[in-house]
Amino acid sequence: MQWQDHAIILGIKRHGETSVIAEVMTRDRGRHLGLVRSGRSRAMQPVLQPGNAVEVIWRARLDEHLGEFRVEPVTLRAARLMETATAVYGVQAMGALLRLLPERDPHPHLFDALEVILDHLHNPADAGELFVRFELAVLNDLGFGLDLGECAATGARSDLAYVSPKSGRAVSRSAGAPWADKMLLLPPFLGVEGNHAADFDSLAAAFRLTGFFLHRHVYEPRGMEAAAARDGFVQAALKALNPALRTLAGPNGVSA
């Protein structure tokens, strides 16, 4: 068995004295593990860092075996990703999200999105918005997609201001007004118009939105918590937009 694919390094685990088991996100074969011989060598260590883009050749006698990777560098961005808190936490948080998906399950759109986000992690506003959209895409692929295109009550596609915590569907401002205190806010940049840039308030609302549904549909049923890196990323992204922010609280909430 053999195949070749574009991949992004998610992490590594030591294996024996000189080798590692690499975890990568491939474009056409999903999240995949493989043994890299001499992966702890001086030549390979800089290549096998999270966030780097590589070309991998996987070989195994049988498809169900772990197999071995031969890894060639393509874009070594790991050093740059260590320069900001949003980048450090962002790489870890996206890896944790991808681990929610079955191994070897293809998600090419998530691979493409991951590459885009990795190249924008230096800009907190861009990184925050892209990360929220990434979380929405993961929710969708897990079978818990949100319907943000029209009002659940009226079918209207304009002035959408809320999301029902029960149905995960958008609600217009007028239809949701009587229950506004029980609704989740729909950030303007996630609306159908999509012509609003993310600012501090809308990004904080977006993190609450995705955090709520990830906790409800994924983490709680699996008896797990969100990765600490997500909280770190949320804090770093929002603090970059509002340096006066001191604390972030709760799995789904933000407090100043």
Swiss-Prot record:
It comes from the Bacteria. Gene3D superfamilies: Nucleic acid-binding proteins, Recombination protein O, C-terminal domain. GO terms for biological process: DNA recombination; double-strand break repair. Pfam families: RecO_C, RecO_N. Keywords: DNA damage, DNA recombination, DNA repair. The keyword DNA damage applies. One of its GO terms (cellular component) is bacterial nucleoid. Involved in DNA repair and RecF pathway recombination. Belongs to the RecO family. This is DNA repair protein RecO. It comes from Rhizobium etli (strain CIAT 652). The gene is recO.
